[in-house]
Amino acid sequence: MEYITLNNGVKMPTEGIGTFLLTPDEAESAVVSALHSGATLIDTANAYVNEKAVGRAMKASGLQREEIFLETKLWPSFYKDADAIDKTLARLDTDYIDLLLIHQPAGDYVAGYRQMEKAYKEGKVRAIGLSNFNIKQMEKIFSICEVQPTVLQTEVHPYNQEPELKAYLKAHGMVIQAWYPLGHADKALLN
């Protein structure tokens, strides 16, 4: 397994399993299989409605929590909910999240980011980041943040390489993480 060190010193696996569009039963089965196959990064989100299943899968895997890199995302409707992160921890049945992202730059995402900073300072979250943000939106976060974001998760694949965005992230000490890294499973790309 390869790792990358984030700007706060946390080591993140470079590969893992995402649970987008998986039903809870599918997510639980897929995560257990992935963990048994050596994958250690699990990506989920409030909006995927399968966080409880991911939590069950982590327990069923037999792995220690420290062996798993758990990543989830805070949905915009929860940005102002003072206990949103505690509710996320409860759904996942865990004491901490390795990487928590703002899912989208919608609504009051600054309030959401502030909540994540608080959770980071309290030790509930090991790293915080962003998802689906453009450069202008990230600049707004950089102008207010006390804790620098570590990761931007966004659509990146051979058909959408984002060289300007990658250069911006590198200059700011952030890592890019791809969703749909195989281009939506495009047959021409895969073959």
Task: Describe every region a protein language model picked out.
Residues 1-68, 182-183:
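N-terminal binding-site loop/beta-alpha segment at the start of enzyme catalytic domains
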Residues 22-25, 45-53, 75-80, 105-109, ...:
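Acidic-and-aromatic substrate-binding clefts and catalytic sites of carbohydrate-active enzymes
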Residues 22-35, 78-93, 111, 135-140, ...:
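Short, acidic/polar
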Residues 39, 94-97, 125, 149:
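A structural motif
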